[in-house]
């Protein structure tokens, strides 16, 4: 485990240095650069835990290589998204949004599957959700204290949901999917609120997508 933690720390420090080397970087507060390191660092930790938990045999090497490429692209993406007017800003924001949800799923699955106490599992989910939400909220130019507060609010919501799942036994992958759906709903709604473009049609779209995905998970539970 210490090798995984050391690698996570090295990736976080490397991403921080990479971001600060950008010509457009302006260092205002320590948290401004720390947020950029969340996704690459958590990608390392989440991939390591998920591969150890869910992947077997020679598939582990392939998954590890794919995870390494993803982490490298995420770190490069953090550099490219320092400047919102940059040519590669849009494509990398999309890539990192997808990567964020994949990392969230890996953590949610592992945390649910492991035999952790409910308070610890809920706190773990809350912490991971808060950090990843702060990464997603960078698209709205929400940084500093505002980013932290909104991230904590989303994290607490997901932590409470993880605690509630204690009363509804699920397979780890299905529970991870449900938590991911909740994370998608929470971050999506907050994103539109911050952009001030949340209307009835958008809210209905999120409700339909969330309900459909949740129904699919429940159906999968019934089948298995």
Functional labels for PLM-detected ranges:
Residues 40-41, 154-158, 175-189:
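Hydrophobic alpha-helical membrane segments
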Residues 14-29, 73-87, 130-144, 187-197:
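C-terminal ends of transmembrane helices
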Residues 165-177, 194-202, 224:
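Extracellular/periplasmic helix-loop-helix junctions in multi-pass membrane proteins
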Residues 1-14, 56-71, 113-127, 169-182:
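Structural signature of hydrophobic alpha-helical transmembrane segments
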Residues 1-39, 46-50:
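An N-terminal, globular interaction/scaffold subdomain
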Residues 39-51, 100-115, 124-143, 161-169:
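Membrane-helix boundary elements
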Residues 202-223:
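Final/C-terminal transmembrane alpha-helix of multipass membrane proteins
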Residues 37-101:
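Hydrophobic alpha-helical segments and helix pairs
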């Amino acid at each position: 485990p210490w090798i995984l933690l050391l690698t996570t720390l090295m990736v976080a420090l490397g991403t921080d240095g990479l971001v600060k080397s950008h010509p457009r970087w302006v260092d205002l507060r320590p948290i401004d650069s720390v947020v950029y390191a969340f996704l690459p660092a958590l990608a390392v930790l989440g991939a390591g835990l998920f591969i150890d938990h869910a992947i077997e045999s020679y598939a582990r090497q392939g998954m590890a290589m794919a995870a390494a490429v993803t982490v490298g692209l995420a770190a490069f993406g953090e550099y490219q998204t320092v400047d919102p007017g940059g040519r590669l800003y849009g494509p990398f924001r999309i890539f990192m949004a997808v990567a964020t949800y994949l990392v969230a799923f890996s953590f949610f699955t592992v945390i649910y599957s492991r035999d952790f106490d409910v308070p610890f599992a809920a706190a773990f989910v809350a912490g991971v959700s808060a950090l990843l939400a702060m990464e997603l909220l960078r698209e709205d130019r929400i940084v500093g204290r505002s980013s932290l507060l909104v991230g904590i609010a989303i994290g607490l919501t997901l932590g409470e949901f993880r605690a509630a799942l204690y009363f509804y036994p699920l397979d780890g992958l299905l529970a991870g999917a449900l938590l991911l759906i909740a994370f998608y709903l929470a971050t999506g709604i907050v994103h539109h609120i911050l952009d001030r473009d949340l209307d009835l049609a958008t809210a209905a779209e999120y409700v339909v997508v969330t309900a459909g995905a949740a129904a699919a998970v429940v159906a999968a539970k019934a089948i298995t």
